[in-house]
Curated annotation (Swiss-Prot):
Its main location: membrane. GO terms for cellular component: endoplasmic reticulum; endoplasmic reticulum membrane. Interacts with target proteins during their translocation into the lumen of the endoplasmic reticulum. Protects unfolded target proteins against degradation during ER stress. May facilitate glycosylation of target proteins after termination of ER stress. This is Protein YSY6. It is found in: Membrane; Endoplasmic reticulum membrane. Belongs to the RAMP4 family. The chain crosses the membrane at residues 45-65. Keywords: Endoplasmic reticulum, Membrane, Transmembrane, Transmembrane helix, Unfolded protein response. Present with 846 molecules/cell in log phase SD medium.
Length: 65
């Protein structure tokens, strides 16, 4: 192994100081968001959709006849 110059020693110390933060925990992950549950459940959404579409179909049938 070669002998380090003072400039290399300072550069290595600076590099180690910056990387010491991430060695224990890893780099911070940004941009990930937590998934939240929908405001209304799928069951209630299906019931509401059935009522709206079914009501519209009945209106069309009564309008045609």
């Amino acid at each position: 192994m070669a002998v380090q110059t003072p400039r290399q020693r300072l550069a290595n110390a600076k590099f180690n100081k910056n990387n010491e933060k991430y060695r224990k925990y890893g780099k911070k992950k940004e941009g990930k968001t937590e998934k939240t549950a929908p405001v209304i459940s799928k069951t209630w959404l299906g019931i509401l959709l059935f009522l709206l579409v079914g009501g519209g179909v009945l209106q069309l049938i009564s309008y045609i006849l």
